[in-house]
Regions:
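Short secondary-structure capping/junction motifs at helix and strand boundaries
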Residues: 1, 21-25
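Positively charged, Gly/Ser-enriched RNA/tRNA-binding surfaces
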Residues: 2, 6-12, 17, 35-184
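EAL-type cyclic di-GMP phosphodiesterase domain
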Residues: 24-33, 176
């Protein structure tokens, strides 16, 4: 399952709850923990950051009822038009991936019945520039290799190690020694 959200949805939904005491970025960081903490714990964290209890509850309610931005809705529609099944895509209005450098779409790959994600990423238009490079919009993702292998083993998707035949050629007499070592 691919969970999707975008910064526009997060910022537009949660900005009304920010103040001089608590930034929208800080609210987003707390909301992003909804997959790990209870709603009561997230509300308590928001209150500890300076958001009044009623506003913290309202922020949580607002994000749970948020709709995708027009940009994200277009991305979801494009994915469907490319043959991605509707059951594979899930809008998650609380998904933020905990990083402020995302500027557009955000996504995480999850395996149904398993906790955590096996990968994630998104759009980050200013990241390369912030690291001293040119101003280049970018999209990227990271795959949790260990997590992916763990899930594949749990689900019996990895076959036992098998030997295979390999042809190793010697391109030059001077490479005969190293080539024979590789062949072993």
């Amino acid at each position: 399952v691919i969970e999707l959200n975008d910064r526009e949805t997060l910022i537009n939904t949660l900005s009304p709850f920010s103040s001089s005491e608590i930034s929208v970025a800080s609210i987003i960081q707390s909301i992003d923990k909804l997959d790990k903490l209870s709603e009561a714990d997230v509300i308590q964290e928001l209150v500890s950051k300076g958001l009044p209890n009623d506003k913290a509850s309202d922020a949580l309610s607002a994000i749970k009822n948020a709709k995708p931005s027009s940009n994200l809705a277009e991305i979801i529609e494009s994915a469907k038009n490319l043959g991605v099944s509707e059951s594979t895509l899930r809008f998650n209005p609380a998904l933020a991936r905990g990083l402020d450098y995302y500027t557009g779409m955000i996504f995480e790959g999850k395996i149904p019945g398993e906790s955590g994600s096996v990968g994630g990423g998104g759009r980050y238009d200013r990241l390369i520039e912030s690291l001293g490079g040119p101003s280049i919009p970018a999209v990227g993702f990271g795959l949790g290799f260990d997590r992916t292998v763990e899930v594949m083993q749990t689900k019996g998707l990895l076959s036992a190690t098998q030997s295979t035949q390999v042809l190793v050629t010697i391109f030059s007499p001077s490479l005969q020694g190293p080539t024979l070592k590789v062949a072993q």
